[in-house]
Amino acid sequence: MSQQLQQIIDTAWENRAELSPKAAPADVREAVAHALEQLDKGALRVAEKIDGNWTVHQWLKKAVLLSFRLEDNAPMPAGGYSQFYDKVPSKFANYTAEDFAAGGFRVVPPAIARRGSFIAKNVVLMPSYTNIGAYVDEGTMVDTWATVGSCAQIGKNVHLSGGVGIGGVLEPLQANPVIIEDNCFIGARSEVVEGVIVEENSVISMGVYLGQSTKIYDRETGEVSYGRIPAGSVVVAGNLPSKDGSHSLYCAVIVKKVDAKTRAKVGLNELLRGD
């Protein structure tokens, strides 16, 4: 079934300029709707770890993008205090008490998750925003004013602190989603964008900004890398001097590495203070 869906969506993507809410083949509409339904349930996801490596299913990202071409904006009620006008309804628009109980997560007013995002059991959504195509795994906390961007992949037992920004892939269009692996802590007001991967058991301090062009400096080895935080890293904001010493530019600094056992035993503040 997935292979057939992929074929229909890949073909529709090549002809997307011809699609509109009033002009789209029935099989394309059905394929896109089914793909979004499966994303919403967590049966499919835009990226998944296979044999230790992350695989991105580009066709599912295409399905999300195609859905914007196939739907008109429409008024959406907002509990009597306002209205919204958009193409994508709330994930919880038609939820009953039984649906919430089966989902096993908490949604604190006025948290918003768009339909096509997946929220796993024991997740807590404080007043925050989770975009279409995102996957938020079990036991994760999405704290107040945090945003989980389109198609972002958030692992188990992750803490996204207040005001954290996890970038999406739709605007501007990105090749790969941001991935935060299991048991990571992302400090307040930090930003992770442009398909950066933060590997498991890592701690990102408050106010760290990570994109594909951000230098990641390993204090222990002196190496500079881009786009990936290694497992068990403790990362703080820093600066690297220019070659001529005339100025310095922002970077992220890996101040130490810890294993899962140490991470579990030692408080976050103690890890971040470092020597």
UniProtKB/Swiss-Prot annotation:
It is found in: Cytoplasm. GO terms for biological process: diaminopimelate biosynthetic process; lysine biosynthetic process via diaminopimelate. CDD domains: LbH_THP_succinylT. Homotrimer. Belongs to the transferase hexapeptide repeat family. Pathway: Amino-acid biosynthesis; L-lysine biosynthesis via DAP pathway; LL-2,6-diaminopimelate from (S)-tetrahydrodipicolinate (succinylase route): step 1/3. HAMAP family: DapD. GO terms for cellular component: cytoplasm. PROSITE patterns: HEXAPEP_TRANSFERASES. It catalyses: (S)-2,3,4,5-tetrahydrodipicolinate + succinyl-CoA + H2O = (S)-2-succinylamino-6-oxoheptanedioate + CoA. Gene3D superfamilies: Hexapeptide repeat proteins, Tetrahydrodipicolinate-N-succinyltransferase, N-terminal domain. GO terms for molecular function: 2,3,4,5-tetrahydropyridine-2,6-dicarboxylate N-succinyltransferase activity; nucleotidyltransferase activity. This is 2,3,4,5-tetrahydropyridine-2,6-dicarboxylate N-succinyltransferase. Its EC number is 2.3.1.117.
